[in-house]
């Protein structure tokens, strides 16, 4: 069996980055002996963020591909890569130059302009992708980009709430809270007004967790559903929320819709999202 060749590919975009990701994956599929490590960097809107991302690229090991529509960013990316001898490919500029040559019209230079085919619909898709990408603390950088950050111990409805709010075009990241676990540094750089600490009563949480274990065909009497452990988790979470200074919502016996409505009201996003309610 031939040995696989490793290759790191940075995918940069000032929008979600799905287009660049799919094109990169299609090209890499032509090389079965290449073992790619594809790292996506979405929502690269500023020069500072762009250079910060590019500074992580190792010239001998990395290819940078990008779809940067924001005016000036693609040129800055190309100049940086040329100077550092980093292999790069601009997926956007060659085609926009051809279109300009044929039409004598300049591109808008606006990130995610494709979304304007139906702003509200595509904004919703973007928010959904954001919620999935930054669910369960997968990438701490998402906390800095989110409209709302949800914190909570296991089974406090973090993921369902994230997806429900994403359906209102709101970018949500969430983080599971586990006693003594490291809290990402990014959390302390988020405006506390954007952070919601989710709580529950020990009794309700105990019932939910026991039912969850039974549904999986497992023994419901474990540390996960132990009342003392649950109380310790909730105490740890409350102490963390107090340190952060964030708003706290008890989700006990509340529907996802009811909790989401409280979150929107407390964060002031209820009016901003209301115009999207009737999109088909």
Curated annotation (Swiss-Prot):
GO terms for molecular function: ADP binding; ATP binding; phosphotransferase activity, phosphate group as acceptor; protein serine/threonine kinase activity. This is Putative pyruvate, phosphate dikinase regulatory protein 1. InterPro entries: Kinase-pyrophosphorylase, PPDK_reg. ADP binds at residues 152-159. It catalyses: N(tele)-phospho-L-histidyl/L-threonyl-[pyruvate, phosphate dikinase] + ADP = N(tele)-phospho-L-histidyl/O-phospho-L-threonyl-[pyruvate, phosphate dikinase] + AMP + H(+); N(tele)-phospho-L-histidyl/O-phospho-L-threonyl-[pyruvate, phosphate dikinase] + phosphate + H(+) = N(tele)-phospho-L-histidyl/L-threonyl-[pyruvate, phosphate dikinase] + diphosphate. Keywords: Kinase, Nucleotide-binding, Serine/threonine-protein kinase, Transferase. Bifunctional serine/threonine kinase and phosphorylase involved in the regulation of the pyruvate, phosphate dikinase (PPDK) by catalyzing its phosphorylation/dephosphorylation. It comes from the Bacteria. Its EC number is 2.7.11.32, 2.7.4.27. Belongs to the pyruvate, phosphate/water dikinase regulatory protein family. PDRP subfamily. It comes from Latilactobacillus sakei subsp. sakei (strain 23K) (Lactobacillus sakei subsp. sakei). The keyword Transferase applies. The lineage of its organism: Bacteria, Bacillati, Bacillota, Bacilli, Lactobacillales. It is an enzyme of class 2 (transferase). Pfam families: Kinase-PPPase.
